[in-house]
């Protein structure tokens, strides 16, 4: 992991400017971790094909590079992971009332202004995904392994109020993302994730409701 401090500013009402984060290396190794498949049940299993996802991620990176021409190609995974991080903060739920507009971060001395509209427009207009219901979630689910690998190396990123509402402990706030498939979670991450769902329901007086789909969690976006 790089020792260089990364400056991150979330452009929304709740987030303080100047959050410092530590950036991960731009390459991510594959993650092969045990999970009990009976612990998390998902009804929403839509994902892109490998070819569709590669094409979309290439378009996302090229769009960002069009705004910042000096970005090295080797950083593509890192740049896509930052977009996935933004998706986790915003929530992919169609019920989300998030009003965030993007972030500004610095990597290797280069400041990048990552507008949410820049990457969401690319996803919505993609031929392989744009015509699907909630295209952002389909893209997020397809890339959740990249998201998890990135977040495990950057555990101090800010996700707003949702992780606190859910009682997610420090260092695991990335589990508030509502596009996770459940695959690749460690046993501890799985336990935290399930506990968070139960906590959100209890805080809203819905003890008799069972969450069987991460789509139900996105609406819990603010305190």
From Swiss-Prot:
PTM comment: Consists of at least two size variants, CP1 and CP2, which result of post-translational proteolysis at sites approximately 12 to 15 and 26 AA from the N-terminus respectively.
Segments for region (Disordered): 1-21
Subcellular location: Virion
Protein keywords: Capsid protein, Helical capsid protein, Virion
Record-level GO cellular component terms: helical viral capsid
InterPro entries: Closter_coat
Biased composition, class Basic and acidic residues, residue ranges: 1-19
Positions of disulphide bridges: none
Name of the protein in question: Capsid protein
Origin species: Citrus tristeza virus (isolate T36) (CTV)
Taxonomic lineage of the native organism: Viruses, Riboviria, Orthornavirae, Kitrinoviricota, Alsuviricetes
């Amino acid at each position: 992991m790089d020792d260089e401090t990364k400056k991150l500013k979330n452009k929304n009402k709740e987030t303080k400017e100047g959050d410092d984060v530590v950036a991960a290396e731009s390459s991510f190794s594959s993650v092969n971790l045990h999970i009990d498949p009976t612990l998390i049940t998902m009804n929403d299993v839509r994902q892109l094909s490998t070819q569709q996802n590669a094409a979309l991620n290439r378009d996302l990176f090229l769009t960002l590079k069009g705004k910042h021409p000096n970005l090295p190609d080797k950083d593509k995974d890192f740049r896509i992971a930052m977009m996935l991080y933004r998706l986790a903060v915003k929530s992919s739920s169609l019920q989300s009332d998030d009003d965030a507009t993007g972030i500004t971060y610095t990597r290797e001395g280069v400041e990048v202004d990552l507008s949410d509209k820049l990457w969401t427009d690319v996803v919505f207009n993609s031929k392989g995904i744009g015509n699907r219901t909630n295209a952002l979630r389909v893209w997020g689910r397809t890339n959740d392994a990249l998201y998890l690998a990135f977040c495990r190396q950057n555990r101090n990123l800010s996700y707003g109020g949702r992780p606190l509402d859910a009682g997610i402990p420090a260092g695991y706030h990335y589990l508030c993302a509502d596009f996770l498939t459940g695959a690749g979670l460690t046993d501890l991450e799985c336990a935290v994730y399930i506990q968070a769902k139960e906590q959100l329901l209890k805080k809203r007086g819905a003890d008799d409701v069972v969450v069987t789909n991460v789509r139900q969690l996105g609406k819990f976006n603010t305190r």
